[in-house]
């Protein structure tokens, strides 16, 4: 199943009246069927297994070496941008289109990806696809909200409001950890959440969302 080039939906860019539409062609099997992991380092019952399964079946993220997903491997920004372009058939734009000149001093695609980096990339990509990004969450509910970079605050607020990013327990507090690194497992989980939020049928079925 994995390794074939398939995308069972397409994102329609425009005014956002119709966000996603089914394409003809191959689609995944019923998402609630038991999944047999093709990876030697991913068990079916791990917290990140649904995300790994989803990005594998969509051919968005690929194995590292022979049958290894490397779920704990750190995701870098350029690799995540490539995943977004693969997922949305280039609708999120090139590096220059996604991050115009005003972002140059604040955001570069070089280096490993933090949680706020991931939020910014998904936020910009979602905006470019004509999908409503006005929802906002309350960053002040997190004890480290002041650590979020100014340019990343709209994206982080949106990611919290949509449920893409969730708080991390740190003692008695809940933190955002905006400067924390992002693993491949975390990235694929957020992609699954994004597709569920946007109404992608397989993603919603996999998470049991009606």
Give the ranges of each region predicted by the language model:
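Short, aromatic- and glycine-rich surface loops/edge beta-strands on solvent-exposed regions
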Residues: 1
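Feature responds to low-complexity, polar/acidic, surface-exposed segments characteristic
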Residues: 9-49, 57-117, 124-153, 166-184, ...
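Short, charged, amphipathic alpha-helices and their helix-cap/turn boundaries
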Residues: 162-164
